[in-house]
């Protein structure tokens, strides 16, 4: 096997072990991948991100943060999920200010996306065919519900209770649940 072949083998082993919840074996495979000199940047980055998740699962939040910061340093377009995980890890170690910064970045990434508006295609009788077409228009992206909820929890920890009002307004618009309406009305 070449170093490149071994790197691919370690990548797939890590992936399989992770999906089978054999976290120790997955971690070993990903660390072996990183040690391979001919592993690609993409494989290395994927392994580092997976290691951050594995450290989080093991409740080693500082280890998770270390891997996530390394991943962010080398990732051209970091995902909102990466920042969301970083925010959760910072929350767990009670670094609430850094957690707010990370969750704000996650939300900004998601809200800055332009989502194409799609409509259903109708047949001659006016029934939906199951096919969707884009209208050419877009709408603003919306962050994941759990990112908004984490931000509210952080504001509570930081004693900024009134700052949750705009978050509840977003939640009732995009994730309408009775508890959000109840809490929003209580703030007014």
Predicted regions span which residues?
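Generic helix N-cap/helix-start motif at coil->alpha-helix transitions
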Residues: 3-11, 40-50, 75-85, 114-116, ...
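Mid-chain, structured segments of secreted extracytoplasmic proteins
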Residues: 2-36
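Alpha-helical solenoid scaffolds that mediate protein-protein interactions
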Residues: 1, 33-34, 71, 106, ...
């Amino acid at each position: 096997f070449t170093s490149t072949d071994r790197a691919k083998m370690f990548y797939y082993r890590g992936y399989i072990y992770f999906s089978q919840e054999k976290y120790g074996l997955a971690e070993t495979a990903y660390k072996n991948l990183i040690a391979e000199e001919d592993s690609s940047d993409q494989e290395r980055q994927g392994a580092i991100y997976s290691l951050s998740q594995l450290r989080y699962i093991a409740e080693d939040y500082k280890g998770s943060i270390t891997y996530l910061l390394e991943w962010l340093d080398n990732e051209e377009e970091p995902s909102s999920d990466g920042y969301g995980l970083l925010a959760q890890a910072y929350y767990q170690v009670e670094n609430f200010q850094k957690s707010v910064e990370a969750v704000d970045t996650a939300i900004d990434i998601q809200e800055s996306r332009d989502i194409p508006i799609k409509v259903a295609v109708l047949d001659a009788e006016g029934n939906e065919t199951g096919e969707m077409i884009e209208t050419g228009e877009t709408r603003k992206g919306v962050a994941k519900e759990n990112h908004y909820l984490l931000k509210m929890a952080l504001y509570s920890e930081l004693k900024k209770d009134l700052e949750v009002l705009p978050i509840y307004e977003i939640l009732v618009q995009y994730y309408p649940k009775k508890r959000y309406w109840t809490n929003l009305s209580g703030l007014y």
